[in-house]
Amino acid sequence: NGIEVVVPVKISKTLNGVQITLKADVLDKLVSSGVKRFIIDADRMADFGFTLDTLKKLNQQTSGNIVLKVKKITVTSVKAKAAIKKPPVYDISLWEVKNVKKTKLTNQKENWTSTERKAKKVKKTKLTNLWGKTISIAIPYTPKKNEQPGNLYAVFVNGKGKPQWITRSSYDADQKAVTFEFTKSGVYGVGYKAKKPVLTDINNH
């Protein structure tokens, strides 16, 4: 029950990445309106679901715009390649972006452009965690003929290239996607194991 807001984002087939901005005043409005679920449908890349609790926490902990960056990448480590045999693999990150102050331009130079006159100092901060909250992510995936959907999991690849099979990840036949809870910025993909893997709570890594 409650209000659900879905924002569709169309992505060109030629693009390997997307940057989606949730403005601070829009976040305020979502929280004050009591939206139970806010979903960013990033077309062929992934769906991102924010609960009201997550929206509230982001609103409490940040003062600028929230920027969601999704970039298609290729893993390079041998272990990561073994776990994620089939694309897509995404570098998913959340950022806070805000204008710290306006920069006053003096007349030391003639013919300032309008862009230069409006120049601002912008501060970008990568959100390394969500303060105990999560974002639900669904990565579209079509199982191969020899793959059992029950053996599909989301995989997190850490900074050293080590893959970690994510707790509470699974294939959702209705969404035709592998779903999991996102807790921190990083590299994510879809992995397959015929035998049940050792799942990891990436919050502790």
Question: How should these model regions be labeled?
Answer:
Residues 20-22, 55-62, 157-163:
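Short, solvent-exposed secondary-structure boundary motifs
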Residues 1, 18-30:
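Short, T/G/N/S-enriched strand-turn elements that build extracellular solenoid repeat scaffolds
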Residues 23-25, 49-51, 172:
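Helix N-terminus capping/helix-initiation residues
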Residues 10-15, 23, 33, 83:
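Solvent-exposed, low-complexity segments and loops of surface/extracellular structural proteins
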Residues 2-4, 17, 35-37, 65, ...:
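A generic structural signal for beta-strand entry/edge sites
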